[in-house]
Amino acid sequence: MAGVSDAAAPGSGGEGRRGGGGSPEQLQQDGCRGEPKTLWGSSELRPPPAGPGQPSPHQRTETLGFYESDRGRKKKRGLSDLSLLRFISAELTRGYFLEHNEAKYTERRERVYTCMRIPKELEKLMFFGIFLCLDAFLYIFTLLPLRVFLAMFRFITLPCYGLRDRRLLQPAQVCDILKGVILVICYFMMHYVDYSMMYHLIRGQSVIKLYIIYNMLEVADRLFSSFGQDILDALYWTATEPKERKRAHIGVIPHFFMAVLYVFLHAILIMVQATTLNVAFNSHNKSLLTIMMSNNFVEIKGSVFKKFEKNNLFQMSNSDIKERFTNYVLLLIVCLRNMEQFSWNPDHLWVLFPDVCMVVASEIAVDIVKHAFITKFNDITADVYSEYRASLAFDLVSSRQKNAYTDYSDSVSRRMGFIPLPLAVLLMRVVTSSIKVQGVLAYVCVVLFYCGLISLKVLNSIVLLGKSCQYVKEAKMEEKLFNPVPSASAGKPAGKPQSMFKSTHGFSTDENGSTSVTNQPVHQKDSPPSLLVTSNSDQFLTTPDGEEKDISQDSSELKHRSSKKDLLEIDRFTICGNRID
């Protein structure tokens, strides 16, 4: 009986075995019913003894384990139901702190501000450059005829005063006469080109063929411009080279015929461009004009994703200035031809006005987008356009000095690739064929119009010179204009009178101190290498911001350069449209 009572006593027997001393199979079954699997037999995990009036530890553990297990199931079920809501709430209330990456976001903001400044700075450069091209273009029609007349008058009246000088004419006067003769010869040669036949020949072609022709003409125009100024410079130097030099050229006459042929072919090329644009204007559905304008946006693809330095961007900016001014002249030619066909009816001008605005607007939009993304991808600031404008202003100011080494129109041609002679020949041909001058009153109007052009040229030159001085002063480049003139070469004998002295830029001046616009360079064979002087404006451009301190090192390295390397550099600068110094 004692054994039975002992087995039935609470806390012992079956319950005791269930609570802690059961077999492993019973423990496993209890664990499946949600009871804890902890083995209370271990001394470390044995529960504390139960107090009076409390259930045994094993019973309490079982009861609590059951309710805790049931509550855990409900909690897990609630978590599984609310997981999507909690994720959405976490996404809606999640925060972050931008100030931890302040430098990155500041740089991005500056890029946005730079892109916003690009249109203003670019158009300021374009505006200044277009007026520079206009000044060089008006020079052909206004001051060049007067200078040619003065040079011819000097040549005719020279025997009356005696031959006091070795030269019959000054180098600048020789160049002016050559320009005038080339202009007149090419003008008469253009009369043999039938504009009407060319118009109908182009109009009969398909749209795709005209699109291809227009692209080829743009490429040919750039090639002609890059090589044409070299032909003209070779002619000017051959005609004014000192006679005591060893003859190393083919002669003035072959160079002259090459220059005439170049100006004539380039004028025909521009005429074909103007004719193609005229056909696009007169097309019924304007599809050709739209395709031609969309061709400008191809420039964005070809330019934006390339590596650009400051010098490359300057060359492209000059090319854009020249291209925009040339397009303005082409639009003027198209309007003149259309107004002539409609008997100068002013109502037809308003028909052409939307197309003209579309061409101009597309050109401006393409330039802005192209320059904005080029500066963004290459980390170029918008202040670089002020440097470009100051460099162009330096060219203008230096050409007005007494020791100027070239004419300003030639300087613009070398810097921007804009050659005004072919464009002037074509405009003269179109104007004279479109406007008939008959009667005394008509000639009076022509004289008044010529006086107006001279007034416009003088006013434009004065304003440009004033603004150029301001830009040069703001860029702190005025000290480069007042370099001391080096002494004569040391390799010449002292007893021989020297009639030529080396000027600041390596060009010559006369003995009496009078200098001309196109003073000729002195032969560099006898002069020491240290007297080689580069152009100040080119040095300003080709020197990046952080390399101004290395100019002295570059000048020391210049002494060790060979003449062959210098010639290669001159050819490279010539192809790129830079100035030849």
UniProtKB/Swiss-Prot annotation:
In this chain, composition skew of type Basic and acidic residues spans 549-563
| Record keywords, A-Z | Cell projection, Chondrogenesis, Cilium, Cilium biogenesis/degradation, Cytoplasm, Cytoskeleton, Developmental protein, Differentiation, Membrane, Osteogenesis, Transmembrane, Transmembrane helix
Biased composition (Polar residues) is annotated at: 500-522, 532-542
Query: Which cell locations does it reside in?
Result: Cytoplasm, Cytoskeleton, Microtubule organizing center, Centrosome; Cytoplasm, Cytoskeleton, Cilium basal body; Membrane
Q: How does it sit in the membrane?
A: Multi-pass membrane protein
What does the record list as GO biological process?
cartilage development; cell projection organization; neural crest cell development; ossification; positive regulation of bone development; positive regulation of cartilage development; positive regulation of cilium assembly
Question: Which superkingdom does the taxonomy of this entry point to?
Answer: Eukaryota
Record-linked Pfam families: DUF747
Q: For this UniProt entry, what's an example GO CC term?
A: ciliary basal body
- Give the Gly residues compositional bias ranges: 11-23
Residue spans crossing the bilayer:
125-145, 182-202, 250-270, 417-437, 439-459
**Compositionally biased residues, Pro residues:** 46-55
Fetch the InterPro entries from UniProt: Tatp1
The record's region (Disordered) falls at 1-72, 484-563
Report the protein's function.
Answer: Plays a role in primary cilia formation. May act as a downstream effector of HOXC8 during development. May be involved in cartilage and bone development. May play a role in the differentiation of cranial neural crest cells.
Similarity comment: family membership: Belongs to the TAPT1 family.
- Any idea what this protein is called? Transmembrane anterior posterior transformation protein 1 homolog
